[in-house]
């Protein structure tokens, strides 16, 4: 759409939402973020294939180590979901939430400044994060 400068998707059901054409028609930078422990929308199955269809050189796929589908949800430790354990809620949801905010900011700042969006293995808020561009993601198979 006109006036749209970037898109950020988090734990996206890529195969369900985007269909066969995926994100191919989006001509702005996209930051797609998934968690390495996400059992609901596993990054390789749900984010990689749609990401590989993107054409913009500043699009990025970020995988947050220890992040789950629920890591992004702000919850108190005494809530029932948090008692399910790290297999479902991730290693440390608060750190992952900080990392998500920082990933958003880094991505948008790079676009605002007219530079290239960050890529590579990064420590974001103390969390290891793998940020891939199209070239890095190309040889990967879901």
Residue map of PLM features:
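Generic structural signal for short, flexible, solvent-exposed coil/loop and linker residues
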Residues: 2, 19, 50-51, 119-121
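Primarily recognizes the serine-hydrolase "nucleophile elbow" in alpha/beta-hydrolase
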Residues: 1-20
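Divalent metal-coordination and catalytic microenvironments
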Residues: 7, 61, 108
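Proteins with a high burden of low-complexity, intrinsically disordered sequence enriched in S/T/G/P/A and R
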Residues: 1, 36, 43, 122-124, ...
């Amino acid at each position: 759409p006109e006036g749209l400068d970037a898109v950020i998707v988090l734990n996206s059901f890529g195969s369900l939402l985007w269909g066969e054409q995926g994100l191919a028609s989006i001509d702005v930078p996209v930051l797609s973020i998934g968690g390495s422990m996400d059992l609901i929308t596993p990054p390789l199955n749900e984010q990689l294939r749609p990401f590989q269809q993107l054409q913009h050189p500043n699009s990025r796929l970020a995988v947050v180590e220890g992040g789950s589908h629920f890591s992004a949800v702000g919850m108190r430790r005494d809530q029932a979901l948090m008692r399910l354990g790290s297999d479902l809620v991730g290693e440390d949801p608060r750190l992952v939430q900080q990392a998500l905010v920082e990933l958003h900011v880094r991505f948008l700042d790079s676009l605002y400044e007219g530079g290239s969006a960050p890529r590579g293995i990064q420590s974001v808020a103390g969390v290891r994060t793998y940020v891939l561009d199209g070239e890095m993601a190309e040889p990967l198979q879901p």
